[in-house]
Amino acid sequence: MQTVEPGSWRAGKTSSSARGYDYQWQKLRAAHLKAHPHCVFCLRDLGMVGWPPEAVVIECALRGVREPVGTIGDHIVPHRGDDQLRLDPDNVQTLCKPHHDGEKAMNERRL
């Protein structure tokens, strides 16, 4: 179970909605994932950064590798309660759960 550090912007915010993951965020996340369905870290690892989704699907089939579908709309810069960052469509990237919980989490702990 994750704990919230004293003084954190999340202290006392027990629901996901109170932490900024409300209807506005859900709409932004859904639109982003529809337009950008692939994990950006997986694309980086496969050498396919910037490729259109259709080309990624075809190339993965040709290479015989799993399509790098992402399910998480992740804030590039942690919003820490800042609504401008939280709802900025340019501050969202698609990640798969392993990259979100692994590499991204490790990078954020360093901040």
Regions found by a protein language model. Name each.
Residues 37, 101-104:
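Generic structural signal for secondary-structure transition and capping sites
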Residues 75, 99-100:
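Histidine-centered divalent metal-coordination motifs
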Residues 39-41, 72-80:
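Histidine-centered catalytic micro-motifs used for acid/base chemistry in nuclease
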Residues 26-36, 85-88:
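Short, flexible, mixed-charge glycine/proline-rich loop motifs
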Residues 82-99:
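Short beta-strand-alpha-helix junction that forms the catalytic/metal-binding core
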Residues 1, 40, 93, 97:
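Cys/His/Pro-rich metal-binding microdomains
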Residues 1-31, 43-69, 81, 105, ...:
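A boundary/linker detector
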